[in-house]
Curated annotation (Swiss-Prot):
The keyword Transferase applies. GO terms for molecular function: rRNA binding; tRNA (uracil(54)-C5)-methyltransferase activity, S-adenosyl methionine-dependent; tRNA binding. Signal peptide: none annotated. It catalyses: uridine(54) in tRNA + S-adenosyl-L-methionine = 5-methyluridine(54) in tRNA + S-adenosyl-L-homocysteine + H(+); uridine(341) in tmRNA + S-adenosyl-L-methionine = 5-methyluridine(341) in tmRNA + S-adenosyl-L-homocysteine + H(+). Its EC number is 2.1.1.-, 2.1.1.35. GO terms for cellular component: cytosol. Dual-specificity methyltransferase that catalyzes the formation of 5-methyluridine at position 54 (m5U54) in all tRNAs, and that of position 341 (m5U341) in tmRNA (transfer-mRNA). This is tRNA/tmRNA (uracil-C(5))-methyltransferase. The keyword Methyltransferase applies. Disulfide bonds: none annotated. It comes from Saccharophagus degradans (strain 2-40 / ATCC 43961 / DSM 17024). The active site is at 323 (nucleophile), 357 (proton acceptor). InterPro entries: MeTrfase_TrmA_AS, SAM-dependent_MTases_sf, TrmA_MeTrfase, U5_MeTrfase_fam.
Length: 365
């Protein structure tokens, strides 16, 4: 939907968004006939993270991307990556110039990853097909100073963090700033402007529900923190150790006193809630003490499995954030046997692509 890979096309932005809204209305007409709440993205400079292959020809390296499904045909970037955040656009040519001037930094470099924030903080990861030496580290330190970015070097069984491997992002929801540690290897929402709109939408939608909240797939606490203001207690589950550590840091950093994190999968949580088995990870958590009114899910692209569908259908209120409309439609076919859709939103996380991020509020019939 773009003329070139990685290039924004603001003149066509509204048309592509209208097309997504139309496709969403048609796909979900069996479940929702009302208006879809459409949340647009900035038309350019919206991606806070990006990764590039490094294509090498002779003594020169280039940034390269791939068309979907054509992963053996790299396209070298000879134009500005205008979907990228301003900080990424600023870093890319400066980094390339320094790398190409240094055989030590350039040789066997095969991938570069950028992670940035709305305040201009950044981590830049250089990934190599070679062991990283003290000499490399010395040049990488100079690179970090020159670019004012945190540098990480990665190779097989090697990770060298020169200063830190994370950034701290601040998003403001209902007038309250929330600060998030975003770790270089962890999942974060790539479009900060749209992420903030998603958080605000979820907070507004749950403003009067009360009771306790259970959240599955909580990640680094992205939704957990602002949603905690609307509930008495929050129990959030996450399987990734890295994400759990980040979530615990973010909870403490933001002074949220009513959130408990449990490192377990949705399947394990179902077993615990049903009393099928006991988990040492829950030894300090009294599940019977919770009065769950609402469940929040933001699953991976595969959507919810049957057991998790059955689990969340117990709750009076369901907030479902989906990155895959097809699996959302499949899940709604079952969830709408017990619940009805009250609100439906479309978030344009990835302009100029076919990707559609959706949010649905369901209440028990």
């Amino acid at each position: 939907m773009t003329t070139k890979l990685g290039q924004a096309n603001p003149a066509n932005y509204q048309q592509q968004l209208d097309d997504k809204e139309k496709a969403t209305k048609e796909q979900f007409s069996d479940f929702w006939q009302g208006d879809i709440e459409v949340h647009p993205s900035p038309p350019s400079h919206y991606r806070m993270r990006a990764e590039f292959k490094m294509w090498q020809q002779g003594a020169e390296a280039f940034y390269a991307m791939y068309q979907p499904g054509e992963y053996k045909k790299p396209v070298t970037l000879e134009w500005e990556f205008s979907v990228g955040a301003e900080k990424i656009v600023e870093l890319m040519p400066k980094l390339l110039e320094i790398v190409n001037a240094s055989e030590l930094l350039r040789k066997r470099l095969f991938q570069v990853e950028f992670l940035t924030t709305t305040t201009g903080e950044s981590v830049t990861t250089l990934i190599y097909h070679k062991p990283l030496t003290e000499e490399w580290q010395a040049e990488a330190n100079a690179l970090a100073s020159s670019l004012n970015t945190h540098i990480i070097g990665r190779s097989k069984k090697q990770k060298i963090v020169l200063t830190q491997d994370y950034v701290e992002e601040t998003l403001t929801i209902s007038g309250t700033p929330f600060t998030y540690k975003q770790i270089e290897s962890g999942f974060t929402q790539p479009n900060a402007a749209v992420c903030q709109k998603m958080l605000q939408w979820a907070v507004d939608a749950t403003a009067n529900l009360g009771g306790d909240l259970v959240e599955l797939y909580c990640g680094n606490g992205n939704f957990t923190l602002p949603l905690s203001k609307n509930f008495d207690k929050v129990l959030a589950t996450e399987v990734s150790k890295t994400s759990v550590k980040a979530a615990e840091y973010n909870i403490e950093k933001n002074g949220c006193k009513n959130i408990t994190i449990a490192r377990m999968s949705s399947e394990e949580f179902t077993e615990a809630l049903n009393g099928v088995r006991e988990f040492r990870r829950l030894k300090d958590i009294e599940l019977d003490s919770y009065n769950f009114s609402t469940v929040f899910v933001d699953p991976p692209r595969a959507g919810l499995d049957e057991d998790t569908e059955a689990l969340i259908s117990r709750f009076d209120n369901i907030i479902y954030i989906s990155c895959n409309p097809d699996t959302l439609a499949n899940n709604l076919a079952n969830l709408c046997k017990t619940h009805k859709v009250e609100r439906f939103a479309l978030f344009d996380q990835f302009p100029y692509t076919d990707h559609r991020e959706c949010g649905v509020i369901l209440t028990k019939k």
